[in-house]
């Protein structure tokens, strides 16, 4: 009630101030009347009593003024009057207002966009309930090279082991499992190849996102007797089924099994595998040991409230090592298990936020961008501060008059800060509008196919934290822009302004060094931003022009999926069987006949992405042991992929068809095993194929049928190194053999036309061999490289480039404003010079030399600062030094050219001064 009363009082004071004055008059009259009554009772006449009462009470207006000064509402009223005066003043100088708001809006808008990207990717990337407690169990092979080793990443375990982890842990509120792959979905309209995520039946309740239509998968769906169901993604529902609202309840055949669609998820839901099309429940009964369920699942867990990541990691490590003792083939000899927060995992080397086998991580790029945008905000603030200083100099006579009339220094400072606040708030609104369009642009960029892996569940928008940042930026810009000009205006010298010409010329020259210093700071900061953006661009160029050892152009990749058991999980061992390999060979022969296809090869890897670890290789009778990548491929790989033979020959048709134990090695393996000697005709021994797993523990201890053990291969050829660990890593030792161990199930189809245009034809040719064959056609190999190798640095360039461009634009505005103002102050000087015989070129040179001096000072400071700061960028660039002279030289040249261009217009104006007019100029 007290609050409501105070609120009513405030509103009354603000909007009905005349009533407050009337009430005070009435109260004062009553006090005087009461005192007069007392005096009258003491024997004085009424007239004398009233006279003495008024004398004792004093001036009524004085008391009313004292009451007003003690009322806090008066301060609000004073601020409101300052606000009104600021609006009237700013309306008189619309060009200044437009320039200031434009500069600040650019800074605030750019800062808001980058902060939205930064916050939403780092802290709001997961759409699940209580996402802050989501963690991903991971495993690291301690015998591999750091976190970038092949076995680093998600922890995979058996279904039965997942049940054990659930029962034995005390740190997880819940833990679920999921897998990934491809299925064939059929209905009366056609056949679709879709990405599937088999999930434990409680996974949708765990994630906690409400479906757009219908329901999600429930624990009852995982019971063996439950009817087969599935849930569809928004993307698939809209793209493949035209957003049919009547789709629920329809039955589809998925890998030969009828399943009923029970739900469609919202657009943001991308759980359990980015870009999944459908989700199916994994049938599971605690304690079951059916062989087709002994595949492996990735895990996702939610910590109990109050449990730290460190304590959860310690307990998980103990449990998983206990499980590893029971299934030693599933795990490396030395490893550790731990948990990472879901956001940290997604942004790290194992998630979407890193270049394949690289130190370039989106998380670090985002921190660099945040620092860059704060520099941009400083440039905008110094720009506006320069404009405000110029304006304050012109208004010094006005400030002097107000000071003479009784305005305190604090009141003058407050008035100018109010003007800065009006500018900043208006710029904030304009900046938020710019940011809204900017974030639409970011979403458009991120949702391009090449960048589809970045922030699949992230929504970029003006949410509460982003708006809070924008308001904070507004408050800081008010202080940074307005405080120094306001304090300088508050120290105005009265006498020169009251007796002088009132134009502020002396003050302008007095403040010139400070304003020049602000321009130097702007130039220096822009140099830092441009150098950072330039290094990232140069790095991206180097990255995209690495010789990978093969030709990725016009290559379409087709990956065959293993058949699935009752659980919905893949039977990978069956893929390596003779029956499975024979079926793939029929597909190869069929595709070779397709018009537009130049060649077809089959192997077990995607070029550029493995294998980069595998079994141990040695020379029979020797002691040197080398871990080598092992690629099982056919006779067409070398020509189809454009690999270069160095010596000897490639695998022949006879080698592949008769499973000959011959091998082609790359230069790295030949050099490591035989030095400078000739490797042709020599032998290598593969110690054990059981060490060769496709990803983590995906084989889960199940070996392909009859793999050779300690097999000896004769080297028949040497091929140029292929970068199978990504473009940034040196080539790993590799051997190429016939499909003997895991089988070859990935096709590389080289086309004579655009690969994407062949997708439908390739699909139909494979289905002509076997309509039930399950496969997925990946993007053309160039696009695949784009997504997994170039997307993260491209994202950094896409954001840092515009920031650097805006910084350069603001510097041009800053240099132009300072030089234009300097020219206006020196109009008389230029007129006198020209009257004494100076030519237009002489005046032009004076102005350009002053501008060039500012630029050189800023460039020197900026280059020195860049040399110190770019070391923080060193881990995010590749193929170029952090102090690359070409980048620094290009940036300096760009700043000099644009800076002199900004000086040119004021210089030409100075050179065009009429001496007669200038000599009359005040």
Model-assigned labels for residue ranges:
Residues 1-100, 302, 337-339, 345, ...:
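Negatively charged linear elements and acidic catalytic determinants
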Residues 37, 50-56, 60-66, 111-248, ...:
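Structured, solvent-exposed hinge/loop segments at the ends of secondary-structure elements
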Residues 66-98, 349-358, 388-414, 418, ...:
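Alpha-helical transmembrane segments of integral membrane proteins
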Residues 95-121, 125, 380-381, 424-429, ...:
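Short, strongly hydrophobic transmembrane alpha-helices
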Residues 338-375, 777-806:
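Peri-transmembrane interface segments
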Residues 371-400, 412, 475-489, 534, ...:
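A hydrophobic alpha-helix feature that marks transmembrane segments and, especially
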Residues 383, 406, 412, 837-843:
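Glycine/proline-centered hinge or cleavage motifs at structural transition points of membrane proteins
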Residues 511-922:
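Conserved positions within well-ordered secondary-structure segments
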